Amino acid sequence: MSTSYSYNTRDLKFILKEWLPVEEIFQYEKYNGYYTIEDLDMMIDQCHNIAAEVFAPYGDEMEEFGVKFENGKTTVHPGFTRIFKYIQENGWGTSNIEETEGTLPEVLQCAIYELFQAACPPMRAHALTSGAARLIQEFGSEELKKMFLPKMFDGTWAGTMCLTEATAGTDVGDILSKAYPTSDPRIYK
């Protein structure tokens, strides 16, 4: 369980600074001038502290609480809301994926998520919001973008992944169902 969070950041720093081409990524126009390889230690150390202080205290409780579905309402542990709000307000969540200069490269966001998940595994679900927002950002109509993205970026709303076929899991190739468009571009059968 996560209450006794213990994570040695040495391997993570090695992978990011010496094994992966993160320094090259920092040269991309979107990141150039915002990050340097020297920033990595500070960023990882800060997120390590956030994981220990914000995430880890809820680890055991959230594991035991799980998710409840009663009377048509889904309930998560109250700590989920507190942590989700914290990461959104401090730029470590969905707010980071806006298509603007200065956002974190995906490789760093994943490294940060690893630290957070190590401290409190149930909170990994918060990353689904980033995926859902990216999907809308890339493929959604302007109407959908205006409707969903502002509230997903500011942490008011979250996103999810719905697996409709238990036998397929996340293996898209094993999905048997099909969706056909209707006269309403928002609805598929």
Region spans (language model):
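Amphipathic, small/basic residue-rich leader segments at the start of a protein or domain
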Residues: 1-127, 139, 143, 147
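Short loop-to-beta-strand entry elements in the cores of soluble alpha/beta enzymes
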Residues: 128-135
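Glycine-rich, Trp-frequent "lid" loop and neighboring beta-strands that shape
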Residues: 143-189
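Glycine-centered flexibility sites
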Residues: 91-94, 101-103, 131, 140, ...
